[in-house]
């Protein structure tokens, strides 16, 4: 199976996933799915949820603030100011939605009220 590596970077954290089958993100151009051996690409990401599908059939959900995604050499790097990984064992759905909403609201405040 074709897989690739995804790395998230923020000032406070760094998270890596190996064995990724697909990555779903939302950028300025709309929804985008990254697969293994994707052509080199650079895109501005909107705040929101990123879905990481692993080769073992599991999914990871990551909430980010706005950021930049770069794809090169079968690696994907995401640079953002905030990273929050959702884990059902740790978070309940309500607290996760509240965290996601707070990220969206801070983005809207920054963009439209500044």
From Swiss-Prot:
Q: Which InterPro entries does this chain map to?
A: ATP_synth_F1_dsu/esu, ATP_synth_F1_dsu/esu_N, ATPsynth_dsu/esu_N
Q: Which Pfam families match?
A: ATP-synt_DE_N
Gene3D superfamilies the record matches: F0F1 ATP synthase delta/epsilon subunit, N-terminal
Q: Main localization of the protein?
A: membrane
Q: What does the record give under GO molecular function? A: ATP binding; proton-transporting ATP synthase activity, rotational mechanism
Instruction: Say yes or no: keyword 4Fe-4S present.
Output: no
Membrane topology, as annotated, equals: Peripheral membrane protein
Q: Please tell me one Gene Ontology term that the record gives under cellular component.
A: plasma membrane
Compartment(s) of residence:
Cell membrane
Membrane spanning stretches: none
Q: Which CDD domains match?
A: F1-ATPase_delta
Keywords associated with the record: ATP synthesis, Cell membrane, CF(1), Hydrogen ion transport, Ion transport, Membrane, Transport
Q: Does the keyword Transport apply?
A: yes
Quaternary organization:
F-type ATPases have 2 components, CF(1) - the catalytic core - and CF(0) - the membrane proton channel. CF(1) has five subunits: alpha(3), beta(3), gamma(1), delta(1), epsilon(1). CF(0) has three main subunits: a, b and c.
What is the similarity comment for this entry?
Belongs to the ATPase epsilon chain family.
Job of this protein: Produces ATP from ADP in the presence of a proton gradient across the membrane.
How is this protein named in the record?
ATP synthase epsilon chain
User: What is the source species?
Assistant: Wolbachia pipientis wMel
């Amino acid at each position: 199976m074709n897989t690739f590596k995804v790395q998230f970077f923020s000032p406070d954290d760094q998270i890596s996933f190996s064995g990724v089958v697909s990555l779903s993100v939302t950028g300025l151009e709309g929804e985008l799915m990254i697969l293994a051996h994707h052509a080199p690409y650079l895109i501005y990401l909107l705040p929101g949820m990123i879905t990481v599908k692993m080769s073992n059939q599991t999914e990871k959900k990551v909430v980010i603030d706005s950021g930049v995604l770069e794809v090169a050499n079968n690696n994907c790097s995401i640079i953002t100011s905030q990273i929050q990984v959702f884990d059902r064992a740790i978070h309940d759905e309500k607290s996760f939605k509240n965290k996601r909403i707070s990220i969206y609201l801070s983005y809207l405040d920054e963009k439209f009220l500044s």
